[in-house]
Amino acid sequence: MKLLTFCSFKGGAGKTTALMGLCAAFASDGKRLALFDADENRPLTRWKENALRSNTWGSFCEVYAAEEMALLEAAYEDAELQGFDYALADTHGGSSELNNTIIASSNLLLIPTMLTPLDIDEALSTYRYVIELLLSENLAIPTAVLRQRVPVGRLTTSQRAMSDMLASLPVVQSPMHERDAFAAMKERGMLHLTLLNMRTDPTMRLLERNLRIAMEELVTISKLVSEALEG
């Protein structure tokens, strides 16, 4: 089982949204997934509850409470026994022994960020913290920045400047663009199953097209992430 961790010091950086999106992309490819909910607010647990009500949750995916060390250890042990392909961890903001343990146990680390000065500053701080932690533990774990909520059209001058600041860091080649489909995942459930349900409703054709474009974007990102995980 490979562990993919989403981490950022900043709340609202897009960790949970990125995890939900990649979860849908991996699941659509037949992967079995364990989700470690290490945020004390348990956003993944609420996501599953919403999805079950909408019939947009798959049996190939399970959410584990992991906001305490004992819960994390139990979750990891059970997920290994269940034979999941990937575990996706949603950390809480800031640094802690729990976050450090998750980071040090990972096969790949993703640091989501939006292209604003505050977000980029927090992403750089998170990246420095992660690298220093890995060096102190004599670990070499691939770490990359995932750009979030990038405009579909042209970037502003400020956004281009923020993007340029990331040039010296490993960055996932394809970003997640700003799309209603991504913003609505928390309420609608797994994107690929939401899309599947809409395909049977001719009145939802325009929305279905938007969801399909969003899903294609996630599949592209998931392939890049899978290559790094399996590499």
Curated annotation (Swiss-Prot):
NCBIfam families: PRK13849.1 (NF010423). InterPro entries: DNA_Partitioning_ATPase (IPR050678), P-loop_NTPase (IPR027417), VirC1 (IPR009744). Gene3D superfamilies: P-loop containing nucleotide triphosphate hydrolases. The Ti plasmid contains at least six transcriptional units, designated vir loci, which are essential for efficient crown-gall tumorigenesis. One of its GO terms (molecular function) is DNA binding. It comes from the Bacteria. The keyword Metal-binding does not apply. PANTHER family: COBQ_COBB_MIND_PARA NUCLEOTIDE BINDING DOMAIN-CONTAINING PROTEIN (PTHR13696:SF96), P-LOOP CONTAINING NUCLEOSIDE TRIPHOSPHATE HYDROLASE (PTHR13696). This is Protein virC1. It comes from Agrobacterium fabrum (strain C58 / ATCC 33970). Keywords: Crown gall tumor, Plasmid.
